[in-house]
Amino acid sequence: MRHILNLYENINSTARNNSDCPAVILPEEIFFTVSIVGVLENLMVLLAVAKNKSLQSPMYFFICSLAISDMLGSLYKILENVLIMFRNMGYLEPRGSFESTADDVVDSLFILSLLGSICSLSVIAADRYITIFHALQYHSIVTMHRALVVLTVLWAGCTGSGITIVTFSHHVPTVIAFTALFPLMLAFILCLYVHMFLLARSHARRTSSLPKANMRGAITLTVLLGVFIFCWAPFVLHVLLMTFCPADPYCACYMSLFQVNGVLIMCNAVIDPFIYAFRSPELRVAFKKMVICNW
């Protein structure tokens, strides 16, 4: 969010005066390289699903939704670097109307990436729940039509929320609402998880075992959720500290890691496709076919 980033620049000198922790500055080339890799990897996921009819199922469509979210996060940093480069070359007027509009568009991509990731993980969690505990009715409950409707509503809601957050980003309540979405949605997913694994344990006692493929999907979701929390939580905490205690020495010390937290977000988009490939034999085969055909 432009308001958050500008606020960071304004309080940076104050933070340094109140903390012995120097700001960690990373080369822009690192951000750019990681972002490019993230875009290419997630684009491979989308192409693999698009080219293989065997992968065109609700589960993989939900995975594609998460891949799009990751790709938007990488595109955000690429476009931001391009805007900075043009401004440094004198092609953009600092704080001009075009730059402000471009900043809003880029910031919308960033917010959309976070909201899309949270919502996509929630949908995948619900899909895994139905797969495990309503396996016989799964194909009648989770149809392609319903999956597409859910994804359409999901992205329409995320887009509207993203535009609203960017438009009113200078208001503290908006920042609070933005950061509150993160723990609230994660709480929903974790509650679903606890319920899922408690039922799985109960079912395992009454029956021989749950289908291994279904449990593999649940484990994949667990890994995806863990990586998401690890990569995004530091930034969300940074936003909260920047809003409520920017001059506190301890808060300022943590905020000196601003760029490191940014790299973690970019790394999320790079790690997720490896998780898909490692946990899904079908997707792994599709990746191999794509690589062999290109060679």
From Swiss-Prot:
Which residues are sugar-modified? 12, 17
Disulfide bridge map? 21-253, 245-251
**What Gene Ontology terms describe where this protein resides (cellular component)?**
plasma membrane
SMART domains from the entry?
7TM_GPCR_Srsx
Q: Where is the lipid attached (S-palmitoyl cysteine)?
A: 293
Coiled coil location: none
The segments annotated as topological domain Cytoplasmic are 50-58, 127-147, 200-217, 279-295
Q: What Pfam families does this protein's entry cite?
A: 7tm_1 (PF00001)
Q: Which residues cross the membrane?
A: 24-49, 59-79, 105-126, 148-168, 181-199, 218-244, 257-278
GO terms (molecular function) for this protein are:
corticotropin receptor activity
Q: Can you summarize the PTM annotation of this record?
A: Ubiquitinated by MGRN1 that may be involved in post-endocytic trafficking and/or degradation of internalized receptor.
The protein's topology relative to the membrane is:
Multi-pass membrane protein
Cellular location(s): Cell membrane
- Topology check: give the Extracellular ranges: 1-23, 80-104, 169-180, 245-256
**What InterPro entries does the record point to?**
ACTH_rcpt, GPCR_Rhodpsn, GPCR_Rhodpsn_7TM, Melcrt_ACTH_rcpt
Subunit composition?
Answer: Homodimer. Interacts with corticotropin (ACTH). Interacts with MRAP; this interaction targets MC2R to the plasma membrane. Interacts with MRAP2; competing with MRAP for binding to MC2R and impairing the binding of corticotropin (ACTH).
- Functional summary from the UniProt entry: Hormone receptor primarily expressed in adrenal cortex that plays a key role in regulating adrenocortical function. Upon corticotropin (ACTH) binding, facilitates the release of adrenal glucocorticoids, including cortisol and corticosterone. In addition, MC2R is required for fetal and neonatal adrenal gland development. Mechanistically, activates adenylate cyclase (cAMP), the MAPK cascade as well as the cAMP-dependent protein kinase A pathway leading to steroidogenic factor 1/NR5A1-mediated transcriptional activation.
Name of protein: Adrenocorticotropic hormone receptor
Q: Which gene encodes it?
A: MC2R
